[in-house]
Amino acid sequence: MNTFGREFRITTFGESHGKAIGVVIDGVPAGLELTEEDIKRELERRMFCHIPVLNPRCEPEEVEILSGVKEGYTQGTPIAVVIWNRRVISSYYEELWMKPRPGHADFAYYLKYGRYYDHRGGGRASGRTTAAVVAAGAVAKKILALAGAEVAGHIVELGGVEINASYTYEDVKKSWERPLPVVDQQALDKMLEKIQEAAARGDSIGGGVEVWAVGVPPGLGEPHFGKIKADIAAAAFSIPGAIALDWGMGRALAKMWGSEANDPITVANGRPTLATNKIGGVLGGITVGTPIYFRVWFKPTPSVRKPQQTVDLAKMEPTTIEFKGRYDVSIVPKALVALEAITAVTLADHLLRAGLIRRDKPLEK
């Protein structure tokens, strides 16, 4: 499926080397301020062109809102957004036709779609397709703001280099002022070195990111199959390259005694709340009003400039390929922005499901 969400619903389309990437967003109330610049601003956060090996394509994002917005306000009808693909070089992929790249979705797409899948630039499985998710996230973040909530994330590991510093949510947001959003300067310096080392080797690196959502009201989510944690996890694994997820303190929590792991319940400002937040803002699949936080790990980019063993599917014979085209040394920075976006989409959907944001009448100015 290419559609996600129930009340705030997005449908993405497009391939890496097609004419455009795009998304149709349904469920947005009338009266929300929205411009192409709002979407472009979010898309530019995923570019990282100041580190060329992270984005050799470095494509200026040409955004068009085709429907659902008039004079800077949403109309309550479906919003269609396209992002045009301009810097496409498909010649690199001619020699890879029917020769799936190890570690890439090429092989799985062949098994499912046969010779009809578009392998150029990774086609529908390319990280480029997350631009559509980020566009949807730009709208979702505006929905969250109506409820006083926001989402931000940072890189916690890259190429085996992990952060080693205490930090707050404000530190996470401020980290975006650095070359990469990393709260630990020493770790950042080592990560930048690792990026250049991988590029020099013709190889790639993976890593992990952490996303926070603060100001999320209590009561979002359902007891069983609509758990907020399950929905966010499903959304997270829709981002290409995602391989693992830790919620709250995650595996560290699993190693504690129950008496240590439990967050005490207290009263603050006349309301019950958690004294600590080891669980990451969710109990029983339902938000409790404390910050949501979780980590997702991404594998190294499959495309590398090293000989890789595969099969020529046209001949059904073993062969070796060596990728010569443009590739991102790491997908982690771009994946972080996409993960922020799809988290915002999921939370916006739950706000509408709970009736905290109404889609059946215009927003009050």
Curated annotation (Swiss-Prot):
GO terms for biological process: amino acid biosynthetic process; aromatic amino acid family biosynthetic process; chorismate biosynthetic process. It catalyses: 5-O-(1-carboxyvinyl)-3-phosphoshikimate = chorismate + phosphate. It holds the Pfam family Chorismate_synt. Pathway: Metabolic intermediate biosynthesis; chorismate biosynthesis; chorismate from D-erythrose 4-phosphate and phosphoenolpyruvate: step 7/7. It comes from the Archaea. GO terms for molecular function: chorismate synthase activity; FMN binding. It comes from Pyrobaculum islandicum (strain DSM 4184 / JCM 9189 / GEO3). Its EC number is 4.2.3.5. This reaction introduces a second double bond into the aromatic ring system. NADP(+) binds at R46. This is Chorismate synthase. Belongs to the chorismate synthase family. InterPro entries: Chorismate_synth (IPR000453), Chorismate_synth_AroC_sf (IPR035904), Chorismate_synthase_CS (IPR020541). Reduced FMN (FMNH(2)). The keyword Amino-acid biosynthesis applies. Keywords: Amino-acid biosynthesis, Aromatic amino acid biosynthesis, FAD, Flavoprotein, FMN, Lyase, NADP. The keyword Nuclease does not apply. FMN binds at R124, A125, S126, G284, K299, P300, T301, P302, S303, R326.
